[in-house]
Every structure is written in C-alpha cells, then in structure tokens.
Amino acid sequence: MPVGRSLSLDPNLLAQLQSHSPTLWLNPHQGMPLPDFAPTAADLADADARLRRCAGLLAELFAELRPSGGLIASPLQPAEPLKRAARAGHAQAGAWYVKRDDVLPVAGSIKARGGFHEVLALAESIAERHGLAGADTDRRALASGAARARFARHTVMVGSTGNLGLSIGMLASALGFRTVVHMSADAKAWKKARLRTRGVEVVEHAGDYAKAVDAGRRQAAGMPCCHFVDDEGSRMLFLGYATAAAELAAQLAQAGRPVDARHPLFVHLPCGVGGAPGGIVYGLKALYGEHVHAFVAEPTASPCVLVQLAGDAAHPRSVYDIGLDNRTEADGLAVAQASPLAAALLRAQAAGAFTVDDRQLFAHLLDARERLGIDLEPSAAAAFGGPAWIAGSDAGRAYLRGRGIDPDAATHVIWATGGSLVPAQEHRRFQAHARAQRQVGGAGA
C-alpha cells in the first residue's frame, strides 16, 4: 500500500504534502461541538488568576520581570511596513500586527506562558500540601528557604526541542526544584548551554522530539516525587497559553480594533505539537466565538497538526506515516505527531493550516528584521505568510467570500514565538543565510 493511503487524506492534499509544496488547508470541521474534556470557563479563569497572584513571586525571582510587576506579557506591534511590502496586491488588506512573544522575559518565547503556569501550579500544590502556603498567602513565600528546601525534594522533568525546556528549566530551577530536560536532536546547542548554566540537567537524545518526550516520561514514571511536564497532553500548559487571549483582547481594544461580525480577527500561529496555538485559539474562541479565524503554520517537513486534523480523528497519525522526514531549520516546530489534546480542540476551532518551507522561513525572518526591526529564530517566522495566504490565494479568497468577510475590515495578528535569547552570532548566521538565499532566487510568500 502506498505511503499515506490509509490515512483518509484527500489524495490531492496528500500529494501536496508529500511534495513539500507550501499548502493552505481549510478545516471543514470548524464549528463542530467541542469534546467533553474541553476546559471550562472556570479553568480559564483559574489559570489567569494563578499567573496574577504569582506575579510578585516571579518579579522577585527574575529581575527581567520587575518592570511588568511579574506579569507574563508581550507587546502588540503594528506591522504596516510588512503589509506594504507584501507582493500580492490583495494581501495588503486589513490591519496587520505582530504579537511579540519573542521578547517575553526570562524564557524568550511563547513557552513562558504555558511552562511558567504549569510550574507555578505544581509549586502551589506542594506548598499548600505541606502547610507552606494557603489560599490567601502572598506567593512570594514560595521563594522562602523553607519552600526551596521542600521543592528540592522534588524533580521536574520535561522533553523538549528547546524552548519549552528553557521555560520549565528556568523557573523550576529558580524555585529550587531538581530539574531535568530531555532534549531532542533538533535542540540548539546554545539552549542546552543556557540551561546548564542554571544548574539544569540536560539529557541529550539522538532521536526526534517524540523520542525525547517518551524518554522523559519513562524516566519520570520510575522516580518518586517527580512531576513530568507532558507537552503532548498537559492541561496546565494548555491553560497557561490560553491566558494570552485576554491580554491580546485588551491590546486590540486599546488599538481601536474591534472584533465582531463586521471586523473579524485572523490569528496566524506557528505550530509544533499544537499546545501553544491550541491554547491561544481556545482562549480567543472563548472571548470572540466565530469572529476569530485561527490558522496554524507548520513546516512542510513537519505538518503534524494538519495531518491529524485532515485525517481520521480516531487514530493518532505521524508525518512519517505519509513519508515526510520531520527535518527542518524550524527546530521548535520539528514535531512528527500532534498532541491529542490540542488536536481534538483545534479540530473544532481552527479555521485551517498552512505549511512553509525552510526557504520561506528565512525569507520571512529577513523581512521581520528589515521591515520591523525584529530578530527572530526561524520557527518564530513560520506564520508571517498567513495574511498573504488568506487574501492572496484562491482557497483563502474562497474562505473570505464564503463568510461574507470584507478583507479591508479584518485584523491580522501574526504570532512571533521566539528569538530574543538567541545569541547575536546565531542571528547574524540566520540573516546571512537569508540574504544569500535571496541573491540566488528568493522565496515565495
């Protein structure tokens, strides 16, 4: 049987994916009922409340967070220069913004949202269980000597391609937990080095993301007092990401950009295993319902969420099942199989997915530098082609027509997910590669 034949994928879509051709896929399942295990409004409120009551603790632990009072928040940057430079004429419609999670302090990526939330939830639980904190206790007590001594008896473990490991590792080690990060072959050397300087134990694996996660999960299962942060199924991570929705809503209101039937919001999100975009989409849908249209961006070598959403929902699928190799410069997105939790929720809520090849990643990275003054890592540039896909492709225009959307009234938010902690020499290497690529032929949108 040919590779991919048993996945219930449309033959034309399968051929496009197997040829590594950048593709826009529209989700026919959008609007279906949410699964029974979907988070509740109370779950979302609890996550937001946790990050707020722990803000003072975070500000005490990390000087970088003191200007925000310990709140995990990033700016919303207008992207008109990027819009003007878009090559497809229709792609210039609406208002464009970049959500700058690339500059989130301490972790330097979107993973601060989910990772910090999970570690804080664990720390609160342990502290309350041992009488070190109560419901009304100032959470700065979690940085006390007594709390650190208690946390030191516990291990926090995670499997990662890099950025989630940084997020978990930085906070867990700062609180006094023994911290172990299993890192895949895709993880960058500087990320491993940064963790080790904080006393984090880094376990390197020759295999991909899934193998690193599985190794961590198996090790944690045999250890007492060990908490495994499961990027493939953690509700705490998911809810931490979802808190970004209220932050974005406040920023859009301040910018005078309403979100309603006449003024839809399009959000374009880089996607690896699916937890971060899934959580953000879930939070935005809770606020805006059908007026938000979310598209996830994946490498052509690693479209694990697209494969899962477009295929049979009942069976987990991998990009290896359709003959792809999961090899991409977008190390943070090099994931072969989607999170079952995130995929089930995105199936009901995502508008679609698009893929981007490595040449496009570097072209977008250079556009971000030259047009907006933003230095990104390659995976963080994955979603920059989103507005052009929507307004400049046949499928995108059909999506707009089918919903009676006026492109000029839309707001597009492109999520930039990481880059501020990348060493300067790495940024220079990325940009030199992108400029050399441009000289020998450039890349599409």
Curated annotation (Swiss-Prot):
Classification via Gene3D superfamilies: 3.40.50.1100
Gene name of the record: dsdA
BP term (GO), one: D-serine catabolic process
SUPFAM superfamilies the record matches: Tryptophan synthase beta subunit-like PLP-dependent enzymes
InterPro entries per record: D_Ser_am_lyase, Ser/Thr_Dehydratase, TrpB-like_PALP, TrpB-like_PALP_sf
Listed cofactors: pyridoxal 5'-phosphate
Domain of life, source organism: Bacteria
NCBIfam families from the UniProt entry: D_Ser_am_lyase, PRK02991.1
Name of the protein in its database record: Probable D-serine dehydratase
Positions bearing N6-(pyridoxal phosphate)lysine: 111
Catalytic activity: D-serine = pyruvate + NH4(+)
Cysteine disulfide partners in this protein: none
UniProt record similarity statement: Belongs to the serine/threonine dehydratase family. DsdA subfamily.
